């Protein structure tokens, strides 16, 4: 897929004579269109179909989390083991590396960094847009804005929970209970932020002290749950969309590069490897789409887009070659391939580490409540990374 490297002139000529066969390459690429299309469709539709079949059943949430962790490993391995090394090899080819400025600076790493920063910018912009849209929607529905932070009052309510230590008549806890409560709250705040000091399964009971000394008990534990859940769903939808952009971008590069190639020795194993590649990558994207809760039309559109992108890229590459006689081993072709591949790698690394692995392992209530689930999820992450990395032996 990338440059051939610095080989002696005689060896390079012999390899070129044996492997470069335009007619055989065209037949292989034409046959690969259906295989890659089916593999892509199976990979992305399988998690979506299983989600529809098992939604609401016992173990569904944990199963979906494991699929997502496996998917994160696949995407991380795709970016670091497949995309970035190919991009670096293209820019390190003798036809490119002997020219300036390509020999003076590691452009593969630079553009990978640019890709990650661009993904962060898109993430921040989308988050700000969703936040503003949410406030605007609340205003249209006539809902009151969130209350301002409470100020100090001499008779402020004392929030307690049904599981909290019992207050003595004096309003203070015993030293032993106070130390235990302080340690627990401190750990919760350190791990999950200030809002997590009260667990989601607890109902906050706030004794509202009135002017006449009586107490009105108000339960407020369930008020903010719907808004937080809706915000999490919006975030997941945004993650899925940005992730699909990065994967589709990468798939176009793969398809166009393969379509322009006339090297039969490279195309033959590449067809098999790309088929497995699309299955695993599709499972990764499909798991994220399934968790985001899109409508049927949006899910169908995203599945179709992923399925047809690589075959369309192959057709585009074949068309470019036949119309222009474009040489896939020319310096300009290698530079374009290397820069676009590096950019795509940075996007995928950011999405895997920040929007998938970090969210699941450090900000997921279900994950934080079970050490066994953490271990199994980590194993799923490693298996996803390993399954995709093994394919680097052939592609």
Swiss-Prot record:
List localization entries: Cell membrane
Q: Which GO terms describe its biological process?
A: zinc ion transmembrane transport
Keywords for the protein's UniProt record, in alphabetical order: Cell membrane, Ion transport, Membrane, Signal, Transmembrane, Transmembrane helix, Transport, Zinc, Zinc transport
Topology in the lipid bilayer:
Multi-pass membrane protein
Spell out which residues lie on the membrane's Cytoplasmic side.
85-104, 263-269, 322-333
Q: Which residues lie on this side of the membrane: Extracellular?
A: 55-63, 126-241, 291-300, 355-374
Biased composition regions of type Basic and acidic residues, renumbered to the chain: 132-141
Which domain of life does the protein's organism represent? Answer: Eukaryota
Region: Disordered, residue numbers: 132-163
Instruction: Give me the Gene Ontology terms describing cellular component.
Output: plasma membrane
* One matching Pfam family: Zip
**GO MF, any single term:** zinc ion transmembrane transporter activity
- Bilayer-crossing residues are 34-54, 64-84, 105-125, 242-262, 270-290, 301-321, 334-354, 375-395
Q: What does this protein do?
A: Zinc transporter that may be involved in zinc uptake from the rhizosphere.
Q: Which family does it belong to?
A: Belongs to the ZIP transporter (TC 2.A.5) family.
- This chain belongs to the protein called Zinc transporter 6
Organism source for this protein? Oryza sativa subsp. japonica
Tell me the gene name: ZIP6
């Amino acid at each position: 897929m990338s440059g051939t490297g610095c080989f002696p002139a005689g060896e390079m000529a012999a390899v070129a004579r044996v492997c470069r066969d335009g007619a055989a390459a065209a037949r292989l690429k034409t046959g690969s269109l259906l295989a890659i299309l089916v593999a892509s469709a199976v990979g992305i539709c399988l998690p979506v179909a299983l989600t529809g079949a098992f939604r609401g059943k016992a173990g569904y949430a944990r199963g979906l989390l494991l699929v997502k962790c496996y998917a994160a490993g696949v995407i991380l391995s795709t970016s670091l083991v497949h995309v970035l090394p190919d991009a670096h090899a293209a820019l390190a080819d003798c036809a490119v590396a002997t020219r300036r400025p390509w020999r003076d600076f590691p452009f593969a790493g630079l553009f990978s960094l640019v890709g990650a920063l661009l993904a962060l910018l898109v993430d921040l912009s989308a988050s700000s847009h969703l936040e503003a849209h949410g406030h605007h929607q609340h205003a249209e529905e006539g809902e009151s804005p969130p209350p301002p932070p409470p100020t100090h009052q001499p008779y402020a309510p004392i929030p307690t929970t049904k599981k909290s230590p019992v207050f003595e008549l004096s309003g203070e806890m015993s030293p032993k209970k106070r130390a235990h409560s302080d340690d627990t709250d401190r750990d919760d705040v350190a791990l999950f932020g200030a809002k997590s000091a009260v667990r989601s399964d607890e109902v906050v009971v706030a004794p509202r002290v009135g002017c006449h000394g009586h107490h009105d008990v108000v339960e407020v534990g369930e008020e903010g749950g719907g808004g937080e859940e809706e915000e999490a769903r919006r975030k997941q939808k945004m993650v899925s969309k940005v992730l699909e952009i990065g994967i589709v971008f990468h798939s176009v590069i793969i398809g166009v590069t393969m379509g322009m190639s006339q090297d039969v020795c490279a195309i033959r194993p590449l067809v098999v490897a790309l088929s497995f590649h699309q299955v695993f990558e599709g499972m990764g994207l499909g798991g994220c789409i399934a968790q985001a809760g899109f409508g049927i039309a949006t899910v169908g559109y995203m599945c179709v887009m992923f399925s047809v992108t690589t075959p369309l890229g192959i057709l585009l590459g074949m068309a470019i070659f036949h119309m222009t006689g474009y040489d896939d081993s020319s310096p300009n072709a290698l530079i374009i391939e290397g820069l676009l591949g590096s950019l795509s790698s940075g996007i995928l690394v950011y999405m895997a580490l920040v929007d998938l692995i970090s969210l699941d392992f450090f900000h997921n209530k279900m994950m934080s409540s079970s050490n066994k689930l953490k271990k199994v999820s980590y194993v799923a992450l490693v298996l996803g990374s390993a399954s995709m990395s093994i394919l680097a032996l052939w592609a």
